[in-house]
């Protein structure tokens, strides 16, 4: 299970594309396809510049009306799912 201290990145075999206000990810090796809503898209955008989940949580708390506990739980669950699908990896 991830913690907020984790640092993640998008693997080289994963391509991303913006489609409207959503982001689509495709793992070219496994064929795994994943779509992110606008909040998930913002998470992915920040992941590429911040890397550390703690920094991403702090930034998103400034942008979205949500409790820290809820945001952390939601982002950790999303990151775990993306790790398991090969769409993220440890940095």
Q: Locations of the language-model features?
A:
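Acidic, low-complexity/disordered tracts enriched in E/D and polar residues
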Residues: 1-41, 45, 91
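Long, charge-rich, low-complexity alpha-helical segments
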Residues: 32-91
């Amino acid at each position: 299970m991830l913690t907020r201290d984790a640092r993640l990145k998008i693997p080289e075999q994963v391509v991303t594309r913006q489609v409207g206000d959503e982001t689509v990810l495709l793992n070219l090796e496994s064929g795994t396809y994943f779509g992110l809503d606008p909040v998930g898209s913002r998470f992915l955008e920040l992941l590429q510049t911040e890397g550390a989940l703690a920094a991403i949580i702090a930034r998103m708390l400034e942008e979205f009306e949500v409790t820290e506990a809820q945001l952390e739980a939601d982002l950790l669950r999303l990151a775990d799912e993306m790790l398991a699908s090969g769409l993220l990896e440890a940095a």
